[in-house]
Amino acid sequence: MRVKHAVVLLMLISPLSWAGTMTFQFRNPNFGGNPNNGAFLLNSAQAQNSYKDPSYNDDFGIETPSALDNFTQAIQSQILGGLLSNINTGKPGRMVTNDYIVDIANRDGQLQLNVTDRKTGQTSTIQVSGLQNNSTDF
């Protein structure tokens, strides 16, 4: 009876022990694997990399202006726009900021802007023709 059980047991287990051919495939494309795996492997390696280069500067030297700087710039733009819109009526204007002094006048149909840099003292004059003929001095 023991022999019968042993034979039956061997017959039941033997199909489970049949081995197939083992094949090995490289995963890494550097060693002959599928090149489509390259992006996946690179992303996996970068996700595991916790090293941060201390000399790496992420902002590319760009300084982000503060909310107060943005507000100041917006107010200056609005005032300068108001001065430019009043020039057609013959009203001259002047805007003084920390950096510049801007004088605006309508001289015989020409828009004249005198921009003075307060730090260096340099003056630039911009003249644009084609305005109405209302002459007004500073």
UniProtKB/Swiss-Prot annotation:
Protein name per Swiss-Prot or TrEMBL: Curli production assembly/transport component CsgF
Transmembrane segments: none
GO biological process, one term: curli assembly
Gene Ontology MF term list: identical protein binding
The UniProt record lists the keyword Membrane: yes
InterPro entries for this protein: T8SS_CsgF (IPR018893)
GO CC terms, sorted: cell outer membrane; curli secretion complex
Keyword Oxidoreductase: no
Subcellular localization(s) per the UniProt record: Cell outer membrane
Residues of the signal peptide: 1-19
Superkingdom as given in the UniProt entry: Bacteria
Keywords, in A-Z order: Cell outer membrane, Membrane, Signal
Function as written in the Swiss-Prot or TrEMBL entry: May be involved in the biogenesis of curli organelles.
Gene: csgF
One Pfam entry name: CsgF
